[in-house]
Amino acid sequence: MAAEAVRAFMLSWLLVHNYSPHQADAMVRQADIESGLQPCIRSRSGSWLFAWTGSRRVALARYADTPGCPGLETQLAFADHELRSEPAYAGFWGASSDRAFPVLRRCFGRGRC
């Protein structure tokens, strides 16, 4: 899937799942930095859309019930699950439109705040 198609799918999915436009944009920007919007890319810095590593990557594999690359929708659902269930990411939900991306980058991008 081409990067523009991934971007469009992500924006649509995130908006349908109650992300504000600035939160959805922040998620797309983060995925672009992590993977170039390539959902199945693997590198030394991480795997798949959000370059998951370590225990987060293992948790995603369990969530998706696959050791290989999960589908894009599954990766988005897992990211959503992480963001909504981990108290460390609460700042993202309360961030102003100009702070949503920096907060997401600092916390979610590193897997912790």
Predicted regions and their residues:
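Hydrophobic alpha-helical bundle architecture
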Residues: 15, 21, 38-42, 64
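Catalytic and binding regions of secreted/periplasmic enzymes and modules that target cell-wall glycans
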Residues: 42-113
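Acidic helix-start/capping segments at beta-turn-to-alpha-helix junctions
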Residues: 26-35, 44-47
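Short alpha-helix boundary/capping elements
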Residues: 34-39, 87
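Export/targeting segments at the very N-terminus of extracytoplasmic proteins
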Residues: 1-31
